[in-house]
């Protein structure tokens, strides 16, 4: 069978099934990906320190696929360092419409026209802020 994902003003759909994200994921049950490239030394160290707080951390090496996984509920989060707009605009849009959340380490949402780095994208604002708390050592 052929599968297709699309959005309209009411949400994100896989074929004709509306995708609804679970916003109750606990850190210890979370599955996600972490970019381990391009961090400054201090952030890289912190990223490695928090990695084992999650159930599973893995990556395809393709953020586009990982955004789809978040929208599909197969992955809960992604922690990203370098942000080229062409890699992130479609995925951030899909995750937002599906009910997920994105924010930089300063809690501001991603804006493609700002030259920025360090983004967390997940199935919920709650999970994003829990990840930020880990990064801040709280």
Feature annotation, model-predicted:
Residues 1-13:
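DPxDG-like acidic metal-binding loop motif
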Residues 16-18:
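Short, structured interface segments
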Residues 20-138:
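An extended, acidic
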